[in-house]
Structure formats: C-alpha cells, structure tokens
Amino acid sequence: MINEQLFNLYASRIQGINALYADLDAKGIKDYAGPLLPYCWEQKYLESKFRLVIFGQETNGWYCDYMNTEEEISKNIGMYKDFRLGTYYNSLFWQYAHRFNMELNGIDDLNFVWMNVNKFGSDSGVGKPEQAVLDDEVKYYNLLAEELAILKPDVCLFLTGPNYDQDIARKLTDVEFHSLCEFGEREAVRLSSRYLPRHSYRTYHPGYGNRISETYQRILNAILSDCKSSN
C-alpha cells in the first residue's frame, strides 16, 4: 500500500530529521515550517488514467512542531489528508492544479498527489526559508527520489517556475532540463531523471502564469497534448 510505504519511509528517517532540528537549533534558526508529508487517496490515484503528481514550491506555513515520533508523523500526514488538496481554498495554485488534473484525467476527485520541491517553507511569511534550512533538508532529509519510487507517477508537473530549477537539481542530482515545443527555457521545459517518469514538466507557478494567462494556457495545453499523444 502506498500510504503504508510512505509512512515507513518517514519513520525510517526520524534520525535524519532530528539531525536537521539539532543543526538549526544550534544556529538559532526557528523561522521554518514543515515538513510537508503527502497522503495518497490510493484507489482514486491508481485508477486514474494518468497517475499525476503536481509539485508546488514550498508550503505557506504548515506543521510547526518537531516531528520526531511516529505519532507526530501520523499527525502531520493527517493534516495533509484533512487539507483535501486545497478543496476549500481558491488560490490560483489550486485552481490551475485541479483544472489540469480534470483535463488530463477527465475527473478531479482527490485522484492526484500534491508535493512541494522544498518540504520546508518560511513560518513567518511566504516563500523559501533561510538557506540553512534548504541546505539541511538536502543533507539530512532529502526523500524525493524515494517518494517518487513509491508513488510511481505517470506524469509529474512542476508548477514551480525557473527559479526553483536549482532546488529540483539538488534533490534529484541527475536531472536534466530539455526544451519543450517552441517555449523558452524559463517558460517550460521537460525534465529527465532516472527518478522521474517520461512525462515530467516544469512551467511557471500559477501566481505568475496567470498574469500571462494566454501564454500560460498554451504551455499547459502543450503539456496535456504531449502526455496524451505519447501515452
């Protein structure tokens, strides 16, 4: 079962996250929230035409307690489950994520998985935490490749924008970025890595993409077409 495998992964890395906490405590760094640990509605996900994982940048606030017991891991995952993929939120990110899933799969009913490139975000505002937090995540708590191995997605869509390409590369060290159709490298790229499915793409975060909505929709349509034409 996917959720059991994810839980076992997180439980096996308690030592790593404790090392992260200890290092950040020693540096006096407290302004961070996370980690974001996903839950999968397994039957819906597995029965979808395309098993889809959509990536954001980092959470805007999240779990803020030390997460170093199995009980706290369960509590963290429960927060994700209760969030229900932003069902009760009307942000641009969730509007575009749900629309893409609907257009890809013909149904949008908790049947994709949401993750973030960075598991930790700032606790006091929006955006990345301090660089030391990002560095320690890579050093002590880089789980992305293992999460992908468990989820086995058919499509990965990174709605992260070009300024997060380096964050992706730090998590998946063999990743390469390739041109996609007629779009410039900042607009949209195809990603290749032994950890990623063939259909892996990065484009703008909806917060920016919606400002250039005509171009953004062309990009998303091109990605959808590429997924469907070579499935």
Per-segment meaning from a language model:
Residues 76-90, 119-138:
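Surface-exposed cleft-lining segments at the edges of enzyme active sites
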Residues 1-12, 130-145, 164-231:
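C-terminal capping/extension of enzyme domains
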Residues 144-161:
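Proline-aspartate-enriched helix->loop->beta-strand connector
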